[in-house]
């Protein structure tokens, strides 16, 4: 936090405002650090899940990995978007189910383990029990020329 910001805080609200601004900044720093460690933890779990799927080749495996990465990205932001993360997780499970020798439970275990979430969260999204779901999207507009 810059000296100029402190000076403005003191002029506007006294030393208590400057102190509060400092505390808020420190809290944000701690939050960023905790997100950083969560991200590293999520990636290590993802690595374990990829090893579990490592014997399987082909496009569905690549899609599973891509969707798990997408879900991790949504979850690891400072303001996570769990709706989009769970949608990506559902797509990962559905792609995983296409792999030889995999069934829904094994896929749920792998994806939920990689994301560090309860597999019931993903299962609930798959069955449509995730808060009512939105209606279908409208038709796309024509190209603007």
From Swiss-Prot:
UniProt keyword annotation of Transcription regulation present: no
The record's subcellular location field reads: Virion
**Where in the chain are disulfide-linked cysteines found?**
96-107
Q: Which GO terms describe its cellular component?
A: helical viral capsid
Q: Which GO terms describe its molecular function?
A: DNA binding
Tell me which domain of life the UniProt entry assigns to the organism this sequence originates from: Viruses
Keywords, A to Z, come to:
Disulfide bond, DNA-binding, Virion
Self-association and partners: Heterodimer composed of major capsid protein 1 and major capsid protein 2.
Q: What does this protein do?
A: Self-assembles to form a helical, filamentous nucleocapsid. Together with capsid protein 2, wraps arounds the DNA and maintains it in an A-form. Capsid proteins probably maintain the DNA in A-form by non-specific desolvation and specific coordination of the DNA phosphate groups by positively charged residues. This certainly protects the viral DNA under conditions such as the extreme desiccation of its host.
User: What's this protein's name?
Assistant: Major capsid protein 2
Q: Which organism is it from?
A: Pyrobaculum filamentous virus 2
């Amino acid at each position: 936090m810059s000296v100029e910001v402190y000076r403005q805080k003191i002029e506007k609200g006294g030393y208590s405002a400057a102190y509060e601004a400092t505390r808020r900044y420190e809290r944000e720093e701690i939050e960023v650090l905790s997100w950083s460690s969560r991200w590293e933890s999520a990636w290590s779990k993802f690595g374990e899940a990829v090893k579990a799927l490592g014997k399987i080749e082909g496009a569905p495996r690549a899609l599973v990995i891509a969707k798990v990465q997408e879900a991790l990205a949504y979850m690891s932001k400072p303001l996570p978007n769990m709706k989009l993360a769970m949608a990506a997780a559902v797509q990962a499970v559905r792609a995983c189910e296409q792999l030889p020798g995999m069934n829904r439970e094994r896929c749920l275990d792998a994806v939920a383990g990689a994301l560090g979430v309860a597999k019931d969260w993903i299962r609930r999204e798959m069955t449509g029990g995730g808060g009512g779901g939105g209606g279908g999207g409208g038709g796309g507009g024509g190209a603007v020329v």
